[in-house]
Amino acid sequence: MKRLLIPALAALIGSSALAQSPKSNLRPDETVLLYCDALGETPDVVYAKKIIPAGFKMEVDNKVDRPESISQGGDLSDISKMARVDLYFPKKPNGQMVVVCPGGGYRYAASWREGLYVAEWMLERGITVAVLKYRIPNGNCTVPLEDVHNTFRYCRSNAEKWGVDQIGVIGFSAGGHLAASASTLWIDQVTRPDFSILVYPVITMEIGVTHKGTRERLIKESAVWNHHLADKYSLQKQVTRFTPKTFIALCSDDKVVPAENSLMYYNALIDNDVPVEMYIWPKGNHGWGFEAEKYVGKGNDPFAYARQEFEASLERWLKEVR
């Protein structure tokens, strides 16, 4: 695979100057482009100086030709051919690596609260991190999963060099659906996660239980084979005894993704004798990610009352699955 060290483009700098910046100075050590050869214009300010084209062939195009855009909170929209992976290497790696799938209803990637801030937390614990800025499906249901599979291929091929011997996945909301897809719809041992962490995930495509926008953007309501796709991407139906051990976290007052999604997946894991831990807190709603008060200010984290408990439980579990 070719390695290129390229300067920032003037156009890219210009667009970034208008963008908001995250409440963290952490930046990736490397940014890997899954399909294209160079990072073009983007308002995204979180990328590495070292850009590496991975050289994967794009099997399915999401047919999105709009430029990327970003919100004040770091929600990165319209990711297409510049699908990329931000790599973060800890000073003292413990052998674990986590592929991070931010949420966003398959419309955008919440690249700060469910990406960058996750990486910062993981790095402090010696975990190598790959934050995946995956393509939006735009009704092409295989697109995000193709990006995850290629991310695992790239990470597995470099694992020995990085001092990594275990690679898992974490996903939030629609990114949780993607992480659960990676955990149930893997192709081989290379693409199979060693463990899975799902935070307020979308699991089912069942109308009335799923998140409507996630379903529509993934499989489109007008698809000829819609009912077959709905079954395939209702991931509680895809769990087997080979599904990786799982950690699930959510709030019972979630008004965006019903808690029943997580319960369906939990029950399927239990039925298939897959080790699972699930934590349900009474309040916090949806989308709290790793956006703690140190990023948003005191009193602005709806999950502050339980965050320490969540982080301690996750840290313990990550040590136990080693």
Residue ranges and their predicted role:
Residues 242, 248-250, 254:
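Short beta-strand/loop motif that positions the catalytic acidic residue
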Residues 146, 150-214, 230:
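Primarily recognizes the serine-hydrolase "nucleophile elbow" in alpha/beta-hydrolase
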Residues 263-322:
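C-terminal catalytic histidine-bearing segment of alpha/beta-hydrolase fold enzymes
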Residues 109-119, 130-166, 304-305:
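Catalytic nucleophile-loop/oxyanion-hole region of alpha/beta-hydrolase
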Residues 22-93:
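N-terminal cap/lid segment of alpha/beta-hydrolase-fold proteins
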Residues 95-103:
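Short beta-strand element of the alpha/beta-hydrolase
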Residues 255-264:
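Conserved alpha/beta-hydrolase "acid-adjacent" motif
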Residues 63-71, 201-238:
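Mobile cap/lid helix-loop segments that gate and shape the active-site cleft of serine hydrolases
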